[in-house]
Every structure is written in structure tokens, then in C-alpha cells.
Amino acid sequence: PEKDPNFVKFGFYNDLRKILTSKMFYPVFITGLSGNGKTYGSQQLCAHLKRECITVPITIETDESDLLGDKTLIDGNVVFSQGPVVDAMERGAVLILDEVDLASNKIMCLQSIIDGKGVYLKKDNRFVKPAPGFTVIATANTKGKGSDDGRFIGTNVMNEAFLERF
């Protein structure tokens, strides 16, 4: 992302900077009210550190094909077109899963990735191991428990096993 000269460091910035500077795999789950800068702050930190950052907006419709890739038709040939998660893994980039609490259980395909183990792409018959520097930041308005007060309609209760990986 492009560096914003007007960006002001706040909140989680210094802790996240230590994690991203180390280039170790350390998945981070950032929660907070809308408009608090969870995603933008993470993107600006990547810009400051000159780290490649791939942001994936998550919705209720997001599935394995959107994240990992799918077969597609190009010039009459069926080829595998890899998704943004695989791109980030192979390039050692920072992957931001934006608004992850809007997702359905279809994002469970990310469990082995969030464990730092890589992923088998069954549609491409290959295993992808994360390159050095790859890590995951997930942002959410809730703590994965849904929204009881109705402020964040559309958020979901997330799988506990998924949440424990952060």
C-alpha cells in the first residue's frame, strides 16, 4: 500500500510493528468498533515497513475458491487461477483478512494456513508452503462471538477452533 503522510500511529501499532518487523509467522486477530483503523492501521504499518500487503475483504459469500483459487477457462484451456491467500503465502506477504467475522464456516479451509503449515490445493494438486515473512492479520468488529446488540448486523459467531489459532 501507499504510505499516507497524514497517518497517525495509535493503539496496536507498536505491538504489531514488533511482530511484522520480526518477519516471523505470528497470526494476529484485531477487534474493535468500526472506523477505528484496524485495517488501515495494518496497511499503513506495512507501507512504513515496506512489506507487501494483500487485503482480502471477507463476506458471508467468501469461500475456498475466493481465497485459495479455482479452475477457470482461459483461451479454451482449463487452468488453475490461484487466489490471494496463495499469492500472499508464496510471496511472503502480510495477508489481511478484513472483517473476518462476516464469514461463514467456508473459511475453515484457512485453518492449516493460520497454523503456519501451508495448504494442499486439491484443485491444483500441489502443496503450498508459506514463504519466509508470511503472516496473517484478521480484523473484526466483534471478537468472533457475533453481535448481540445489533450494531454489527451480519457478523457471525465464529468457530472456536478457528479463533484459537490467533
Residue ranges and their predicted role:
Residues P1-F166:
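AAA+ P-loop NTPase catalytic core and its hallmark functional loops
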